[in-house]
Structure formats: structure tokens, C-alpha cells
């Protein structure tokens, strides 16, 4: 273990003439059987990435969209689901209740991020120190090693790096605000934001509410026509403005009253409230209901049971203890 003072000197000297080393490429299995590439940087590179993250994260957080929940402090999946449910419930007595949704899927989002566009977005969001931008640019172009061969990275942020989640949020932040300005977070003309959204509603603008977690996003609106229009508009927006592609096979327009949306391990539907013993408290309005995605959950339970069964097959005590520790880590997440 390196002494603290010596480590600080090493980091300071590295910042003066920083040259990141190529990351080590590894693959982890996804739930659908495919493999996701991970870039594992060196220990020194990880420390420097964490230093950069500490510097730029507060600046970025001040400009991030309020309904973006992935890889952000004090935000989690449950907050995104709760926001969707609140929006559905708030419009339960309105003819404009958001019961149609666009579920978005970006093809290889993290692997296709344009480096030049990302640096421009960092500048616009408030990162004006050119030394920091230079370090980030070098990190993005450091490349990776696979089977003892060096590969150049022209696109994407390395999944597995400490800074990558923050950079992906910076890249997709313009998309958040592009949709948000349509209705949910309009340009302020009134003293209170509620008056601005009311002004848009009176002008005939169809309500739309967007929620994003990492590269998964959902937009709620009140009509099928508006949902189909948004899908067409956003397909062009991602292609022309973000240099990314929406998967047309996996980008759905969904009626929450019949199918529900699959988002962050839940199936969110708009259904009637369950009848209560007191008829006076029961209404016929639709409310949002988050239900566990049983198909996805069933696969994970089956895999977990297989790992539990392996504990019984372990002959050595230390191997059995390691397997128990692994199973506990999976359960705890």
C-alpha cells in the first residue's frame, strides 16, 4: 500500500502530463444471453477519473433535467417509477390523462457516443477548464487491450469506467430538455411554472411527460396520435442531433390501459382502483399501478436457485463459503 503523501504527489504529477493507459476489455453476460463489454482501467486511471468526477459532477448536476434518475446522487429507480405513477394519478379526473407511452430503446447508446459532440456538450453545460476537457478527451481515446492487441476507440465511453455514467448523462441531457421544453419544463414566461404548463394546455398543446434512467426512457402522453408523432420526431432527433439510432423494433407506443410499459423491472399500467367496502370512497377513475415484471423476475429467481443449489455440491468449506457470499451479494444487489 502506497503512503498517502506519495500517492498525492503521484496524482499531481500525472495531472501535469496525463497519458491514460488502455483499459482491459472484459465481457459480462447479460440477461438476454448476449455479452456486454467492460473496460477496466488501471488503478491510477481510476483515481484520476474519480478526481475529475468530483470536480465536474456538481456543475453538471445543476444543469441536469429534474426527471433524469440514472447514476445521480440521491436518486434511484423507485423515484422514477413513483414519478410516473404520480403523473398518471394526477390526471385521473382529466380527459388529458397520460395513458399512452413511448418506450425508447437506443441502439448501443454507450458504445456510440460521439466524442466531439460530448466535449461540446460539456462546454455548454459549464465545464470551461480546457485542462479538464483535455484529460476527458484523452480518457475517451485511450483505447483498450483485448487478447494482447490494442484497439482504438473512436466512439463511445468505456463501460466500467468511473466517469462514464456521468458523461452519458451529460450526452443525453439535451434530449431530456428537448422533450421537457415541449410541456413539462417550458420556457418561463410566468412567475410560477404551473401557470406556464397551464398556458400551454390552454393553447392546445398535448401534455407529455418524460422520465429517463440511464439509456432507458419513457414519455407519457394522452393520445395515440401524439405518441406516434413523438416517435417519428425523436427518431429524426436522435439521428441528426445526437448521432444515435433508435431501435424501431424495441421502441414501442403502448396503451397503458391494456398492455402497460416495461420500465426498470416493473410493468406500469393504468387500471381502475380496486373496489372498497364503502361505495362512497370508490371511483371509476384510472390510476397507475406498478407491478413486478414477472418474466424478468422469474429468470433471475431461476438463476439464483441454481446458484443456491451449487452450495450443496461444494465439497470444500472455503469454496462453500465463497459461494454463500456470492449468493448473498446477488440477493443484496
Predicted regions: what they are:
Residues 1-333:
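Non-catalytic terminal/accessory segments
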Amino acid at each position: 500500500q502506497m503512503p498517502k503523501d506519495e500517492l498525492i504527489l503521484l496524482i499531481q504529477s500525472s495531472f501535469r502530463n496525463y497519458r491514460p493507459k488502455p483499459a482491459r476489455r472484459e465481457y459480462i453476460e447479460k440477461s438476454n444471453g448476449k455479452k456486454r463489454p467492460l473496460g477496466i482501467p488501471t488503478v491510477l486511471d481510476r483515481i484520476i477519473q474519480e478526481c475529475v468526477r468530483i470536480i465536474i459532477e456538481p456543475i453538471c448536476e445543476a444543469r441536469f433535467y429534474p426527471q433524469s434518475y440514472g447514476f445521480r446522487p440521491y436518486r434511484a429507480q423507485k423515484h422514477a417509477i413513483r414519478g410516473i405513477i404520480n403523473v398518471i394519478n394526477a390526471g385521473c379526473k382529466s380527459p388529458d390523462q397520460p395513458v399512452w407511452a413511448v418506450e425508447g430503446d437506443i441502439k448501443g447508446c454507450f458504445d456510440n457516443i460521439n466524442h466531439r459532440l460530448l466535449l461540446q456538450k460539456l462546454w455548454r453545460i459549464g465545464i470551461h477548464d480546457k485542462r479538464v476537457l483535455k484529460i476527458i478527451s484523452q480518457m475517451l481515446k485511450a483505447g483498450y487491450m483485448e487478447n494482447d492487441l490494442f484497439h482504438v476507440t473512436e466512439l463511445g465511453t468505456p463501460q466500467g469506467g468511473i466517469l462514464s455514467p456521468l458523461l452519458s448523462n451529460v450526452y443525453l441531457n439535451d434530449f431530456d430538455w428537448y422533450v421537457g421544453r415541449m410541456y413539462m419544463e417550458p420556457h418561463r414566461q410566468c412567475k410560477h411554472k404551473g401557470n406556464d404548463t397551464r398556458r400551454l394546455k390552454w393553447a392546445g398543446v398535448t401534455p407529455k411527460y418524460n422520465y429517463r434512467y440511464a439509456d432507458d426512457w419513457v414519455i407519457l402522453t394522452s393520445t395515440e396520435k401524439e405518441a406516434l408523432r413523438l416517435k417519428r420526431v425523436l427518431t429524426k432527433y436522435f439521428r441528426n442531433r445526437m448521432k444515435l439510432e433508435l431501435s424501431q423494433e424495441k421502441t414501442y407506443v403502448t396503451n397503458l390501459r391494456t398492455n402497460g410499459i416495461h420500465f426498470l423491472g416493473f410493468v406500469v399500467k393504468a387500471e381502475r382502483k380496486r373496489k372498497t367496502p364503502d361505495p362512497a370512497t370508490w371511483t371509476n377513475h384510472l390510476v397507475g399501478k406498478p407491478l413486478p415484471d414477472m418474466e424478468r423476475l422469474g429468470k433471475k429467481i431461476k438463476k439464483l436457485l441454481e446458484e443456491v443449489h451449487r452450495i450443496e455440491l461444494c465439497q470444500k468449506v472455503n469454496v462453500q463459503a465463497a459461494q454463500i457470499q456470492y449468493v448473498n451479494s446477488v440477493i443484496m444487489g
